């Protein structure tokens, strides 16, 4: 079994409060979980209202499949119209 983990740093330029950030982050987490069956957690920038650090994890029988699922999830985040910019992405596969 392999696990792919991706750490994303997001910028929310239109956001003006922690409450607004929480709404956007929760929406992204729920959409990713429902669509790709991945685990998503907010891991960084908890007190910054214009930055969010998310970690996305997927487990699969092969590293290639886990990596593909995570890559598709990241592409989906980039395609959402939530005024979110991906400013950093780091993916690693653990076999």
Question: Across the structure, where does each feature detected by a protein language model lie?
Answer:
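Short, charge-patterned binding micro-sites
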Residues: 3, 41-62, 93-95
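C-terminal structural segments of small proteins and small subunits
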Residues: 59-95
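Short beta-strand elements
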Residues: 36-43, 85-90
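Short glycine-/aliphatic-rich beta-strand segments at the starts of folded cytosolic domains
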Residues: 4-12, 18
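Cys/His-coordinated zinc-finger cores
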Residues: 32
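C-terminal binding/interaction regions
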Residues: 21
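Short catalytic helix/loop segments, enriched in acidic residues and glycine
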Residues: 29
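Structural beta->alpha junctions
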Residues: 12-16, 59-62
